[in-house]
Structures are given as C-alpha cells and as structure tokens.
C-alpha cells in the first residue's frame, strides 16, 4: 500500500494502532466508550451552564467554552480512529487531513487562551475580590471568548495554508493516529522552512503568552493565599483554584512533552493520546465533581427535566 514512486500524494495512510491487530476490538470498545463519555460530559456541562442563570458568570463562561473546544477536539480525532480499526486501507484524503488538523489546531489553541483567561479570572477573584465585577465583567469575558475563537481560527488557518503549499511525494504512511503537523513535515518533498518559521512566529508567542499568564496569575494567587490569616479563607481559595491548576498542569505538561523535538517513529503517540483524548475526557469531571455550584445546577436541571417529564406523562393519560 505504501507509495514508493515520486508521484504527488493526495491520500495518506494513518498507521495509528495497526501495530496491535490482536487488540483491535478491545481498543475499539475502549475508544468508543471514551468518545461517548467525553461528548456527554462536555456537552452536558455546556448545557447545564447555558440553562442555569446563576452560572452565567465569567468563570463558567470560560469553562463552557473550554468544554465546547474539548468536544471539538474529540470530534476531530476519535471518529476517524474508530473507523480505522476496521478499515482495510486506513486511508485519509489530503483535504480530510487538512480539515482534521484545522479543527485540532483550533481546539488546542483555544484551550491555551481559555486556560490563561481562567487563571486570570481566579487571580482577580482572589487577589482583587472587591474589584472583581469591574475588572472581570460578564461582557469582558464574552469579548475575551470571542477574541479567543477569532485568534484560534486565524492561527489554525495560517498553518493549514502553509501545509497546503507543501508537496508530498515520499511515503504516504503517517506514523500517527491523526494528521498532525510534524509527521506531515517528514513526508514533504518541499522544504518546510516557511512552515517552521510560522511556528516560531505565531505558535511560540501564543505558548509563551498563555503559559506566562498562567504562571504569573498563580504566583500572585499563592502569595495572596499565604498572606491570609484565616484558615477557612486559605482552604476556600485553594479549593477554588485546585481543579483549574490541576487541569492546566496536565494540559501543559503533555503539550510541552508532545511538541518537544523528537525523532522518526511513533514515540510521541502515548502523549498525544493523553492530551488529545484523555484530557477532554477528564476536564468536565475535574471541574464538576468538586464544584458545588455545578453539582447543584446539574441536580436542578435534572429535577426540572423530571418535573416536565412527569407533567407530560400526566397530560398523556
């Protein structure tokens, strides 16, 4: 199936998890369950935030958008993984590949900005509580979210445009389970210098800006917490930031491990699985299980839905 001539490649083969044919069925079932839980968890969180007026605050606006982007990330990758478990040739066209990368890049870039925005929101809430409503209003959080999507979309389009300038005439086998930028560089017959330059010009500043925002915000938060005389106040502040800090830590550790320089091969696949599939699965539970406001909102929505369901059943009788 692999191309050995120098004709231009318009289709690729996603090698993915084909090295383990004996695990095909268990892996298919595992990824199916992960995909289902991820979509239900994230879209359910978006629905709860939308339906509960008390959650229409900056923190939950950012959280809802984060859940939406995690759903986008999962939709961009997992369906193709599931299809390829039982596909004979595991092919993906060039334009399918570009579309998959576009949505992945959009989701991951937006995640970086949203996590930074959530860190800044927590900084304002803990370090400047009296000025919170003036420094972080609902209107500002909506504007920041819109700006995040516009910037992420432009960032993604820039890299897709640069990828389309490349010609692929080497092997058409992508040693990965999705179309990512670095594995595609390896297959290019065109010098990817401009593409790499775009990474340094656009992607690196985004990473530096968002990581710096998170680090500075949490440094100020920790200083404020340690200055608090009340144990209850410190406990409440730690509890407020713990879930976000845990999520941010996992996301950036995995992302930095993944984008490090690496050799030919598929050594980066386990890390890629974690940050593209596992993190979107975990996020709604990290932010919800220990959050009383979200838990109470879920109970309220379920109770309301149950009331409507019972009323409909009574009317049907």
UniProtKB/Swiss-Prot annotation:
Residues bearing attached sugar chains per UniProt: 5
Purpose of the protein: Potential odorant receptor.
SUPFAM superfamilies attached to this UniProt entry: Family A G protein-coupled receptor-like
Protein name, per record: Olfactory receptor 5K16
Gene3D superfamilies: Rhodopsin 7-helix transmembrane proteins
GO cellular component assignments: membrane; plasma membrane
Localization (cell): Cell membrane
Keyword terms of this UniProt record: Cell membrane, Disulfide bond, G-protein coupled receptor, Glycoprotein, Membrane, Olfaction, Receptor, Sensory transduction, Transducer, Transmembrane, Transmembrane helix
A single GO molecular function term of this UniProt record: olfactory receptor activity
Regions of this protein lying in the Cytoplasmic compartment: 50-56, 115-144, 220-239, 290-317
Extracellular topological domain residue ranges: 1-28, 78-93, 166-198, 260-268
Transmembrane segments: 29-49, 57-77, 94-114, 145-165, 199-219, 240-259, 269-289
PROSITE patterns the UniProt entry points to: G_PROTEIN_RECEP_F1_1, G_PROTEIN_RECEP_F1_2
Family statement: Belongs to the G-protein coupled receptor 1 family.
Membrane topology: Multi-pass membrane protein
Disulfide bonds, paired cysteine numbers: 97-189
Major location (coarse): membrane
Organism this protein belongs to: Mus musculus
Family matches, as InterPro entries: GPCR_Rhodpsn (IPR000276), GPCR_Rhodpsn_7TM (IPR017452), Olfact_rcpt (IPR000725)
GO biological process: G protein-coupled receptor signaling pathway; sensory perception of smell
Gene behind this protein: Or5k16
């Amino acid at each position: 199936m692999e191309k050995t001539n120098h004709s231009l490649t318009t289709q690729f083969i996603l090698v993915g998890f084909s090295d383990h044919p004996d695990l095909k069925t268990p892996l298919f079932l595992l990824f199916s369950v992960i995909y289902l839980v991820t979509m239900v968890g994230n879209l359910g969180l978006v629905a709860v935030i939308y339906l509960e007026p008390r959650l229409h605050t900056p923190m939950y606006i950012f959280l809802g958008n984060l859940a939406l982007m995690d759903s986008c990330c999962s939709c961009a990758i997992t369906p193709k993984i599931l299809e390829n478990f039982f596909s004979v040739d595991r092919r993906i066209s060039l334009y399918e590949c570009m579309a998959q990368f576009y949505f992945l890049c959009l989701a991951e870039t937006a995640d970086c900005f949203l996590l930074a925005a959530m860190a800044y929101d927590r900084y304002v809430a803990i370090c400047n509580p009296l000025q919170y409503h003036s420094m972080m209003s609902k209107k500002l959080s909506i504007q920041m979210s819109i700006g995040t999507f516009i910037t992420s979309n432009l960032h993604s389009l820039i890299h897709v445009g640069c990828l389309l300038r490349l010609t692929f005439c080497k092997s058409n086998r992508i040693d990965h389970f999705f179309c990512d930028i670095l594995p595609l560089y390896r297959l290019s017959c065109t010098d990817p210098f401009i593409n790499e330059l775009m990474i340094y010009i656009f992607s690196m500043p985004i990473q530096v800006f968002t990581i710096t925002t998170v680090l500075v915000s949490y440094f100020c938060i920790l200083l404020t917490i340690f200055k608090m005389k009340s144990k209850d106040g410190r406990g409440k502040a730690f509890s407020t930031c713990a879930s976000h800090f845990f999520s941010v830590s996992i996301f950036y550790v995995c992302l930095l491990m993944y984008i490090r320089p690496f050799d030919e091969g598929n050594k980066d696949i386990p890390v890629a699985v974690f940050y593209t599939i596992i993190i979107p699965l975990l996020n709604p539970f990290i932010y919800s299980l220990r959050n009383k406001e979200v838990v109470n909102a879920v109970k309220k929505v379920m109770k309301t839905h149950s009331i409507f369901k019972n009323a409909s059943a009574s009317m049907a009788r």
